[in-house]
């Protein structure tokens, strides 16, 4: 049963955003609730009342109701359970994506939107198949460490931490979320990280990604608001509401920490 897990306090909000947390009771291994909280924080700064629903096993995904869908990461066991449930949601999620619905997909969620992924054990798990990427495993190796990427289309830089065994390869109609400045990225080619397709943003960044990259959170929320209320909607600039939320490299954070 779909249920509301989080909602803005009552107030005079000019806008409303409905967020679907896909399998939020199962896929929350990497602090993904922090991404939900950041979406809510930024949306409220922009004048939007937020309602977050958990859409999980045997639930319908209402493509016309939700303005943002978040699909987080999980362990192989949970992902295999979800992979069995996803086909019932395929049509609605595919329609949502093709109609420019806003999606943030992290780690396992990113993998499951694609064609398939191969577990560390070598077992192939079928993905939802609504996007063209696929994920292979690797032997005795993981991509672990700090990572920095740059999105040339948006001229934005994102920072994160990666820890993944999978090697993801994008299809010809997909772009990476960003070009790798340092770190590994999607695979051993160390060229791109994540995916950007229509209004789908996928990444392997743990963290959670949005707490460290408020510029990306702002982009997701403003994209959703403009889609719902029109491109001419007047919204506060990023600098006006999030001037203190500057993305920082790990080295910068360490140098500013007070250990006294």
From Swiss-Prot:
GO biological process: cell wall organization; cobalamin biosynthetic process; peptidoglycan biosynthetic process; regulation of cell shape
Keyword Cell wall biogenesis/degradation: yes
Statement: the UniProt record of this protein carries the keyword Hydrolase: yes
Gene name in the database record: gatD
Disruption phenotype: Severe depletion of GatD/MurT produces a high proportion of aberrant cells, elongated or bulging.
Assembly and interaction partners: Forms a heterodimer with MurT.
Domain GATase cobBQ-type: 16-214
Entry-linked SUPFAM superfamilies: Class I glutamine amidotransferase-like
Designated name of the protein: Lipid II isoglutaminyl synthase (glutamine-hydrolyzing) subunit GatD
Role summary: The lipid II isoglutaminyl synthase complex catalyzes the formation of alpha-D-isoglutamine in the cell wall lipid II stem peptide. The GatD subunit catalyzes the hydrolysis of glutamine to glutamate and ammonia. The resulting ammonia molecule is channeled to the active site of MurT.
Family in the record: Belongs to the CobB/CobQ family. GatD subfamily.
InterPro entries xrefs: Class_I_gatase-like (IPR029062), CobQ_GATase1 (IPR033949), GATase_3 (IPR011698), isoglutsynth_GatD (IPR054859), Lipid_II_synth_GatD (IPR043702)
Binding site for substrate: 142
Entry's Gene Ontology molecular function annotations: carbon-nitrogen ligase activity on lipid II; glutaminase activity
Catalyzed reactions per annotation: beta-D-GlcNAc-(1->4)-Mur2Ac(oyl-L-Ala-gamma-D-Glu-L-Lys-D-Ala-D-Ala)-di-trans,octa-cis-undecaprenyl diphosphate + L-glutamine + ATP + H2O = beta-D-GlcNAc-(1->4)-Mur2Ac(oyl-L-Ala-D-isoglutaminyl-L-Lys-D-Ala-D-Ala)-di-trans,octa-cis-undecaprenyl diphosphate + L-glutamate + ADP + phosphate + H(+); L-glutamine + H2O = L-glutamate + NH4(+)
EC annotation from Swiss-Prot or TrEMBL: 6.3.5.13, 3.5.1.2
Pathway noted in the entry: Cell wall biogenesis; peptidoglycan biosynthesis
Keywords: Cell shape, Cell wall biogenesis/degradation, Glutamine amidotransferase, Hydrolase, Ligase, Peptidoglycan synthesis
Residues forming the catalytic site: 107, 206
């Amino acid at each position: 049963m779909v249920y509301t897990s989080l909602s803005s306090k009552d107030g005079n909000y000019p806008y409303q955003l409905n967020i679907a947390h896909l399998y939020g009771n199962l896929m929350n291994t990497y602090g993904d609730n922090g991404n939900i909280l950041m979406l809510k924080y930024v949306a409220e700064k922009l004048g939007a009342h937020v309602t977050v629903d958990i859409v999980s096993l045997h639930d319908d995904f209402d493509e016309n109701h939700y303005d943002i869908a978040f699909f987080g990461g999980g362990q192989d066991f949970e992902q295999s359970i979800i992979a069995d449930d996803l086909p019932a949601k395929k049509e609605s999620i595919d329609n949502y994506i093709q109609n420019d619905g806003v999606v943030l997909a992290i780690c396992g969620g990113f993998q499951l939107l694609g064609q398939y992924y191969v577990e560390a054990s070598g077992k192939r798990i079928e993905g939802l198949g609504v996007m063209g990427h696929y994920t292979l495993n690797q032997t005795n190796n993981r991509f672990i460490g700090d990572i920095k990427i740059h999105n040339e289309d948006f001229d934005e830089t994102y920072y994160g931490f990666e820890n993944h065994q999978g090697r993801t390869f994008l299809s010809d109609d997909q772009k990476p979320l960003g070009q790798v400045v340092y770190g590994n990225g999607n695979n051993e080619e160390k060229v791109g990280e994540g995916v950007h397709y229509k209004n789908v943003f996928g990444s392997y960044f743990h963290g959670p990604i949005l707490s460290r990259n408020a510029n990306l959170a702002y982009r997701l929320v403003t994209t959703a608001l403009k889609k719902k209320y029109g491109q001419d909607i007047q919204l506060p600039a990023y600098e006006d509401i999030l001037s203190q939320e500057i993305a920082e490299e790990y080295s910068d954070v360490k140098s500013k920490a007070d250990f006294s």
